[in-house]
Swiss-Prot record:
UniProt-recorded name of the protein: Glycerol-3-phosphate acyltransferase
Membrane topology reported for the UniProt record: Multi-pass membrane protein
Keyword check for Chloroplast: no
The organism of origin for this protein: Pseudomonas putida (strain GB-1)
A Pfam family the protein falls into: G3P_acyltransf
EC number: 2.3.1.275
Keywords, ordered alphabetically: Cell inner membrane, Cell membrane, Lipid biosynthesis, Lipid metabolism, Membrane, Phospholipid biosynthesis, Phospholipid metabolism, Transferase, Transmembrane, Transmembrane helix
Membership in a protein family: Belongs to the PlsY family.
InterPro entries cross-referenced by the UniProt entry: G3P_acylTferase_PlsY (IPR003811)
Subunit structure: Probably interacts with PlsX.
Annotated metabolic or biological route of this protein: Lipid metabolism; phospholipid metabolism
PANTHER family reported for this sequence: GLYCEROL-3-PHOSPHATE ACYLTRANSFERASE-RELATED (PTHR30309:SF0), INNER MEMBRANE PROTEIN YGIH (PTHR30309)
Function summary: Catalyzes the transfer of an acyl group from acyl-phosphate (acyl-PO(4)) to glycerol-3-phosphate (G3P) to form lysophosphatidic acid (LPA). This enzyme utilizes acyl-phosphate as fatty acyl donor, but not acyl-CoA or acyl-ACP.
Taxonomic lineage of the native organism: Bacteria, Pseudomonadati, Pseudomonadota, Gammaproteobacteria, Pseudomonadales
Top-level class of the enzyme under EC nomenclature: transferase
Gene symbol of the encoding locus: plsY
Length: 189
């Protein structure tokens, strides 16, 4: 059952709401416009608040639904977390869009909502505070994502390895942003 759910999670994660909504609305392809990221923040820049919110909600659900399905199937928390990681992998490397996806932050937040809601609240709160103070989405993601690790190590240690892998994937996807942050070239809102 685990492998079937992991595959379904990857396929669901491969649905890029940013790309689909940009095509349906006639907005620029987020992979080749703005920041080049197929995610909610770039959709806000390119297509406005409404499509950005729809992208965010879709990406959150892509992370949440596979975890809830894994729980309903009776998988333990460790397996649920790996199923969620597969959904994020689908978002990062979508099968349907030549493996050119987003950075996985919203999908990871949805996954955390299903695994351990307090960790999701911590990450979302840290993201919002950092973004409010710096107006920099990438910095907010890079601060918020690793903050969940100590809480999960304490409260849900069986999810720690998958969440550590998830954190590494998100940091890796932000490597260009890290270079731009250090060089003072990162985009701000």
């Amino acid at each position: 059952m685990f492998w079937l759910l992991a595959l379904l999670a990857y396929l669901l994660g491969s649905l890029s709401f940013a790309i689909v909504l940009s095509r349906l609305s006639g907005s620029p392809d987020p992979r080749s416009s703005g920041s080049g990221n197929a995610g909610a923040t770039n959709m806000l820049r390119l297509a406005g608040r409404k499509l950005a919110i729809l992208t965010l909600l879709g990406d959150l659900c892509k992370g949440l639904l596979p975890v809830l399905l894994a729980r309903a199937a009776g998988l333990d928390l460790h397996a649920q977390a790996w199923v969620g990681v597969c959904a994020v992998l689908g978002h990062l490397f979508p099968l349907y869009f030549r493996f050119q996806g987003g950075k996985g932050v919203a999908t990871a937040a949805g996954m955390l909502m299903g695994l351990y809601f307090p960790a999701a609240l911590l990450a979302i709160g840290a993201w919002l505070l950092t973004f409010y103070l710096t107006r920099t989405s990438s910095l907010a993601a890079l601060i918020a994502t690793p903050l969940t690790l100590p809480l999960l190590a304490w409260r849900e240690p069986e999810a720690l390895l998958p969440i550590t892998v998830l954190t590494a994937m998100i940091v890796w996807r932000h490597r260009k942003n890290l270079r731009d942050l250090f060089a003072g070239r990162e985009r701000h809102f």
